[in-house]
Design a protein with these regions (language model features):
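Short amphipathic alpha-helix that is part of the acyltransferase structural core
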Residues: 1-36, 142
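A short helix-loop-beta-strand connector motif used in the catalytic cores of GNAT acetyltransferases and
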Residues: 39-58
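Active-site beta-strand termini and strand-to-loop segments that position acidic
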Residues: 54-56, 64, 140-143
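Conserved active-site alpha-helix within GNAT-family acetyltransferase domains
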Residues: 107-125
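Conserved acetyl-CoA-binding loop-helix of GNAT-fold acetyltransferases
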Residues: 79-95
Length: 143
């Protein structure tokens, strides 16, 4: 467990942006109300349903679906280069915590590219979103 915590703490202290600012930025980009997002996250974390890991200015928010499987969401204010490093760190922490698979749906086609650059195996399937726009369903192998 100490290894997981050590990996999660890996970040450049001088460049740290407060977690709430990262979440505020994510809410703004997605067009959702920050107070609602923050309240939902607080409730889900308190219930044990949701957890957050951080590396640099990237947050990995994940819901535990079943043992070893999590639904993943990334919120970041890192540059693309730092995002690749953060994603590597976060998936290494998930691996050490015993996760084998992560799943997510995103409208950002660049996430698959980031995973590829970070050497994290992912199956990508393009699907039609609720608004008729393309979305990407990713199944990520953590181990």
């Amino acid at each position: 467990m100490a290894d997981v915590m050590q990996t999660m703490r890996k970040q450049t202290v001088a460049d740290d942006i407060p977690m709430l600012d990262i979440l505020r930025n994510e809410a703004k980009q997605r067009g959702v109300n920050f107070s609602n997002l923050h309240g939902m996250l607080k409730s889900d974390i308190k219930s044990g349903k949701t957890r957050i890991m951080r590396s640099g200015n990237t947050l990995l928010i994940y819901d535990i679906l079943q043992p070893g499987v999590a639904e993943l969401h990334i919120a970041t204010m890192d540059s693309p280069e730092k995002l690749v490093v953060a994603v590597k760190d976060l998936f290494e922490a998930m691996k050490k915590a015993g996760y084998k698979k992560g799943v997510t749906v995103t409208d950002n086609s660049q996430i698959a590219r980031v995973l590829n650059v970070a050497n994290i195996p992912a199956a990508v399937q393009q699907i039609l979103g609720k608004d008729g726009k393309a979305e990407y369903q990713l199944t990520i192998q953590v181990q």
